[in-house]
Amino acid sequence: MVMIRLARMGARKQPYYRIVVIEKRSARNGRSLEVVGTYNPRTNPASVELKRDRIDYWTGKGAQMSDRVAKLVQQNPAPAAA
């Protein structure tokens, strides 16, 4: 099963995260299929960048989002089309 979840990056005590598409049984920072965004909790407010089209593609293919990623996607709605 494929998951969309966070992969920790950054130095000790200075984390930032990549939002990755990865096989569920892989290690947290294992080889990912695709990077679909970033999340930096250290900025104020926390910065989130999402590739919505790719997230929609992978969820359409059956990928499950982790609880935290689902919350980040929900808190950061897509911009309205012009």
From Swiss-Prot:
- Determine if Ribosomal protein is one of this entry's keywords: yes
S-S bonds: none
Q: What is this protein called?
A: Small ribosomal subunit protein bS16
MF GO annotations: structural constituent of ribosome
Sorted alphabetically, which keywords does the UniProt record give? Ribonucleoprotein, Ribosomal protein
GO CC terms on record?
cytoplasm; small ribosomal subunit
Query: Which organism encodes this protein?
Result: Acidobacterium capsulatum (strain ATCC 51196 / DSM 11244 / BCRC 80197 / JCM 7670 / NBRC 15755 / NCIMB 13165 / 161)
Task: State the source organism's domain of life.
Answer: Bacteria
| InterPro entries xref list | Ribosomal_bS16, Ribosomal_bS16_CS, Ribosomal_bS16_dom_sf
Q: Which family does it belong to?
A: Belongs to the bacterial ribosomal protein bS16 family.
Which BP terms in the Gene Ontology apply to this protein? Answer: translation
